[in-house]
């Protein structure tokens, strides 16, 4: 899908639904994701999952920027240890106004 204009070109936009597993809670992972996503101009949210070793990320925006975010999710902040990353690409919905941390 296209929809975001950049230099009079339509950029391809998408939505990712990702789950990051490993040592990703208690290491400022959610704030790392929020700050990275905002710098990339993405919208959505990040939240801890109740299982204790996983974080959910919902993000929308330019596909190129989403791919950069995915690289950062794999790396994580200092102190994190990412063991696995599950990603689903879904249709862009435009449902988010900002990128936030959910509780």
Which residues fall in each region the model found?
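Intrinsically disordered, low-complexity, mixed-charge
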Residues: 2-103
């Amino acid at each position: 899908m296209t929809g975001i204009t950049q230099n009079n070109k339509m950029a391809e936009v998408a939505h990712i639904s990702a789950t990051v597993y490993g040592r990703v809670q208690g290491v400022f992972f959610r704030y790392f994701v929020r700050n990275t996503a905002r710098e990339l101009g993405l919208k959505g949210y990040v939240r801890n999952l109740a299982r204790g070793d996983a974080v959910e990320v919902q993000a929308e925006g330019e596909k190129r920027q989403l791919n950069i975010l995915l690289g950062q999710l794999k790396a994580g902040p200092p102190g994190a240890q990412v063991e696995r990353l599950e990603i689903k690409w879904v249709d862009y919905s435009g449902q988010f106004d900002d990128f936030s941390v959910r509780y």
